[in-house]
Amino acid sequence: MKNDINATHYENIPTFADGGKDKYAIHVIIETPRDIRNKYRFDEENGIFKLGSVIAEGLTWPYDYGFIPQALGDDGDPLDVLFLADEPTFTGCLSDARLIGIIRLLKDGEENDRLLACPPRMKGVAQKTDDFDDIDDMPEDMMQSITTFLVQYSEEKKNKVEFKGVASRSKALKALETGHKSWKKKHKKR
C-alpha cells in the first residue's frame, strides 16, 4: 500500500510535454543532480526521494540523472534519462526537455539504456546544448565523459556492463513510446 505522504504525484505527470505538439518534447524528473557523489532514487512505496548510495571518491555525476514519468525501461524500472543542463537542478525537479538520443548499454546481460535530453531552448538565454537536435550534434568528448562515467559507475556497483553504442533521437523516441506503453499496461492492471 502506498503512503500518501508526497503531495507531488509523479505518476500523474505526462511523458510528453508541450501538449504533444512536438514529439521530442518530454518531461524529466531529476533524482540526482550533477557534480555530486550521492545517488538518489524515488521510492514509489513511500512517495519520497531516498538516498540510494554514494559513489566512490573521484567520481561525480556528470549531468543530472533522473527518469521520465509514465515510462518504463526493459528492466521494469522508470526509464532513465541524463539531463544535459549547464547547471545542476535539484532532486525532485520537474523540467521540460528535448529528447536527443539514447545510449545503449547491457547490464548483466539485459538492456539498460539511458535516454539523453537537453533543456528547452530559452529565448534570450544561451545554453551549451542549444545546437543539439540529435545525438550526433554532441561533441565527442562530452559523449565520451558520459559513457566512461556510466561504465565506471556500473562496474563500481559490481555489475557487468557493456557499452553497445548510441542511437538517434528517432530511436530514442521509439524506446520512449515502448516504455510509455509498458507503463500504461502495468498501471491498467492496478
Language-model regions, residue ranges each:
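Hydrophobic N-terminal alpha-helices or hydrophobic patches in metabolic proteins across all domains
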Residues: 1-190
